[in-house]
Design a protein with these regions (language model features):
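Conserved, hydrophobic alpha-helical core segments of structured domains
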Residues: 1-145
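Charged substrate- and nucleic-acid-binding regions of tRNA-handling and nucleotidyl-transfer enzymes
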Residues: 79-83, 137-188
């Protein structure tokens, strides 16, 4: 039998795309290798592109596209991880990273704080590691500048965390009760 049948369609799925030099399975294997030595992050990489074969389209110029594959990959991963009896904590860490692995993290404070609000500190750091591993397993001639940008993004993220900036309402040093005590009132 096959332990992870969700991977089988990736074996024979080429990626005719300037960003990729490997078929889907080879890309997955190389991204697992490029990921930090953390079981959950390596599982993210194992499943992050499993939805590509089901989403593959080829445009009139012969370029392959995989629109919507993060959502399909997340669904496949959820099914596989449940079958493999992954812990609830692992699934709560892994699935959002698969869902957002193609999301854009810009090297600016507003973008980083948006991701911090969505995924928290650990999740945002994990997402940068996932994106770095993903890019490292693509066409490095094209992706190396993006990898370097992710290093800068991670450095800026660490600065934001060291400063103790608020990135969600719960992080503010003052709340509604304090504002009311100071005399602030809402709309009459």
């Amino acid at each position: 039998g096959v332990v992870v049948p969700e991977l089988v369609p990736a074996f024979d799925c080429p990626q005719q795309n300037p960003w990729h030099v490997y078929d889907v399975f080879t890309h997955i294997a190389r991204s697992v290798e490029a990921a930090p030595k953390d079981a959950d992050l390596r599982l993210v990489m194992l499943f992050h592109d499993t939805g590509k074969p089901a989403c593959k389209t080829t445009d009139e110029e012969g370029i392959d596209h995989f629109y919507g594959h993060p959502t399909v990959s997340e669904q496949l991963a959820k099914s596989a991880l449940e079958r493999l009896k992954a812990s609830r904590a692992s699934m709560q860490r892994i699935l959002p990273l698969i869902r957002y692995h193609d999301g854009h993290i810009l090297t600016d404070e507003k973008s980083i704080k948006r991701w911090l609000n969505r995924l928290g500190q650990a999740g945002t750091l994990d997402l940068i590691d996932v994106k770095t591993a993903d890019l490292a397993a693509q066409n490095l001639a094209r992706t190396q500048p993006e990898i370097e940008e992710l290093y800068r993004t991670k450095a800026l993220l660490r600065q934001i965390l060291e400063r103790g900036d608020a990135f969600a309402l719960r992080d503010l040093a003052i709340g509604g009760e304090e504002l009311l005590a100071l005399g602030y009132r809402g709309k009459a």
